[in-house]
Amino acid sequence: MTVPQVGINGFGRIGRLVLRAAIEKDTMSVVAINDPFIDLEYMAYMFKFDSTHGRYAGSVETKDGKLIVNGKSITIYGHRDPAEIPWAEAGADYVVESTGVFTLKEKAEKHFTGGAKKVIISAPSKDAPMFVCGVNEDKYTPDLNVISNASCTTNCLAPLVKVIHEKYGIEEGLMTTVHATTATQKTVDGPSQKDWRGGRGAGANIIPSSTGAAKAVGKVLPELNGKLTGMAFRVPTSDVSVVDLTVRLATETSYDDIKATMKAAAEDSMKGILKYTEEAVVSTDFIHEEASCVFDAGAGIMLNSRFCKLVAWYDNEWGYSNRVVDLIAHVAKLQ
């Protein structure tokens, strides 16, 4: 099977890391990048140097208006309107929509005008079907041309919830994600009309915020629809977040049994998506962690046989970007 030919729209945190992950995994080939706000030389600089994930180990050059990574040429465009991007000209059948702007199906479909055949939105979508690797990607059918990879938090929470629900049953649950700073936040207090707290300085505050990540689990696991909700605290760290899930179980169990269940899933059915650790870890230990979810056995607690708090770590940048690449590989296999 030929590897999928991919274009990336939006060369921000996720766009750049999707390119890195694609090169590492070698399951898809990035042939084009579109970003109207970054010129070619700056694009090369931003890809080469990364404050969180380190300097790119391969070669990065520019030549004849193209970005050359490890000797491979990538066509560069700078269009604001997705309908104007000539994806077919570069040979891109799949598009990673990582601007954070075109998350609605109708807007993402504009990529088809330029020749794209499939669009994978690297964000939650209100109307495009959402798929989480390890959880519901088996529900994907080839007639779906615009899909969402959900959010980084949903990618951590859903595998955890799936394992627990299948073994014990979840009656209801509340999630808090302690979430690293992202590009939408302000370095110092600034205007944020829709979210006043979100406009406060990221480096100086713990900021309560909303998240649809827990409710989105109900979209990828319909049997849990309406049983989970949650919120976020944005904290002054550059990467790695942690899910704190408090659930009421349908059947009685012990925390030792929960640990054994999570460990077994990490070694078998969820291998590569879910990991398990009993070590005394902190957030920086998970920078560049490829798994969607790392269950922290030592951090969870149990109040009684049906009520517990479970903790799982995730690199909200690198883990998520790897799942975008994995989802494209899965979609391509079924075409």
From Swiss-Prot:
Compartments where located: Cytoplasm
Positions annotated to bind D-glyceraldehyde 3-phosphate: 151-153, 182, 211-212, 234
Entries under Pfam families matching the protein: Gp_dh_C, Gp_dh_N
The organism's place on the tree of life at top rank: Eukaryota
Location (main, coarse): cytoplasm
Record site feature (Activates thiol group during catalysis), residues: 179
GO cellular component term, pick one: cytosol
Enzyme class at the top of the EC tree: oxidoreductase
Cross-referenced Gene3D superfamilies: Dihydrodipicolinate Reductase, domain 2, NAD(P)-binding Rossmann-like Domain
Catalytic activity: D-glyceraldehyde 3-phosphate + phosphate + NAD(+) = (2R)-3-phospho-glyceroyl phosphate + NADH + H(+)
MF terms in GO: glyceraldehyde-3-phosphate dehydrogenase (NAD+) (phosphorylating) activity; NAD binding; NADP binding
Record-listed E.C. numbers: 1.2.1.12
Pathways per UniProt: Carbohydrate degradation; glycolysis; pyruvate from D-glyceraldehyde 3-phosphate: step 1/5
Keyword NAD in annotation: yes
GO term, biological process aspect, one: glucose metabolic process
Active site (record annotation): 152
Subunit structure: Homotetramer.
Protein's name in the database: Glyceraldehyde-3-phosphate dehydrogenase, cytosolic
Species the sequence originates in: Gracilaria gracilis
Lineage: Eukaryota, Rhodophyta, Florideophyceae, Rhodymeniophycidae, Gracilariales
